[in-house]
Amino acid sequence: MRVLLVCLLLCALVVSDSEGSHELHGVSDASNCGCLNGGTCVTYKYFSNIWRCNCPKKFQGEHCEIDTLKTCYHGDGHSYRGKANTDIMDRPCLAWNSANVLTKTYHAHRPDALQLGLGKHNYCRNPDHQRRPWCYVQVGLKQLIQECKVHDCSSGKKPALPPGKLEFQCGQKALRPRFKIIGGEFTIIENQPWFAAIYRRHRGGSVTYVCGGSLISPCWVVSATHCFINHQKKEDYIVYLGRSRLNSMTPGEMKFEVEQLILHEGYRADTLAHHNDIALLKILSNNGQCAQPSRSIQTICLPPWNADPNFGTSCEITGFGKENSTDYLYPEQLKMTVVKLVSYQECQQPHYYGSEVTTKMLCAADPQWETDSCQGDSGGPLVCSVQGRMTLTGIVSWGRGCALKNKPGVYTRVSRFLPWIRSHIGEENGLAL
């Protein structure tokens, strides 16, 4: 009963506060509240140990940290404190203090949460200086980092998308990631919508499959230099996006010519290993367009600098590669399997690859040695979940045989080549950083 009376008295004081300011007293030491943006620290008349911020008209929040009139961001949006709270596909953001978000790197309970704009709300923020404000969005069973529907102040008001029109959202796919596949399985392109199938024209009109690749921006595909080193004529290559079958059309696929073919100037091949094995292809359709987003066509996120997943992490590989090195033909249907990242210390053991493996490479294998990338998978993606986003961690490069014990697949470590990628693509809009 005593507790109830105290609660009723406190409620009465709050009500009286809403009706007049005479029940509140200013506090000389505003640090008790941490008020921002000109907010003043006040206390209740009969409860001097309870403080709160009295905010100016355009601000709200526990510390007056939310700018209710802010509708755009400057720079990368690190200082944005507005109220946008959906991603670019209009899905609601998760609150920074929600249970699932509290397990992430950025959440409302961090010691520096106030400085980063995080709190008991679901408004878009950019605490880690990504390209623009973002938030966590519930997609299936996962909480993914998604860019927000808020425009850059310097570019003017962004027009609303027509109903049904999609935008590129790197690392997002229509089907849920499946990191528990054993032995590999045939799949459809919606499972890996960033996968690019690269073909070569021959004299006489025949066309053969060459390698895989990954769409990292609407106009650019990343692959492996060794796929093109012996034939560098860009006009002879064709790139398909949205394709599930090797030699027949998939509804919704797009076909592209190669406008630029950029091979890494430091590429070299040893007896077994390929060094600096990365290439870029600028793609353009016959009507002058780059890729258009759909359920079967999407960009893959590039990794943070030197922030690769931990060894032992399960990742996906995809391609039209052979199931065994002795097979004569490539499979007709796109195939996907799951491998685990292998540590450098293990991969550099003499019975693995020794000194052939460098820090610009990653090793990955099936723990049972039953499935692996193989001939024809070269240039394709090794995709892992990094900070909640599907990310291009590696590019299929080399290995001894296919699924041989103690001989994992070796992949170009994409995080080590971000400066090289940026030097050729620059700050082009749409790069999946």
Curated annotation (Swiss-Prot):
Biological process according to GO: fibrinolysis; plasminogen activation; positive regulation of cell migration; regulation of cell adhesion mediated by integrin; regulation of cell population proliferation; regulation of smooth muscle cell migration; regulation of smooth muscle cell-matrix adhesion; response to hypoxia
Region (Connecting peptide): 154-180
All copies of domain Kringle, residue ranges: 71-153
Domain EGF-like residue range list: 29-65
Recorded superkingdom: Eukaryota
Residues with glycosylation annotation: 324
UniProt key word Nucleotide-binding: no
Processing and modification events after translation: Phosphorylation of Ser-325 abolishes proadhesive ability but does not interfere with receptor binding.
Ranges for domain Peptidase S1: 181-426
Subcellular location: Secreted
One term under GO cellular component: serine protease inhibitor complex
Residues at the active site: 226, 277, 378
Record key words, sorted: Disulfide bond, EGF-like domain, Glycoprotein, Hydrolase, Kringle, Phosphoprotein, Plasminogen activation, Protease, Secreted, Serine protease, Signal, Zymogen
Region (Binds urokinase plasminogen activator surface receptor): 36-59
Disulfide bridges in this chain: 33-41, 35-53, 55-64, 72-153, 93-135, 124-148, 170-301, 211-227, 219-290, 315-384, 347-363, 374-402
Subunit structure: Found in high and low molecular mass forms. Each consists of two chains, A and B. The high molecular mass form contains a long chain A which is cleaved to yield a short chain A. Forms heterodimer with SERPINA5. Binds LRP1B; binding is followed by internalization and degradation. Interacts with MRC2. Interacts with PLAUR. In complex with SERPINE1, interacts with PLAUR/uPAR. Interacts with SORL1 and LRP1, either alone or in complex with SERPINE1; these interactions are abolished in the presence of LRPAP1/RAP. The ternary complex composed of PLAUR-PLAU-PAI1 also interacts with SORLA.
Family (UniProt): Belongs to the peptidase S1 family.
Protein name (record): Urokinase-type plasminogen activator
Organism, as annotated: Oryctolagus cuniculus
GN (gene name): PLAU
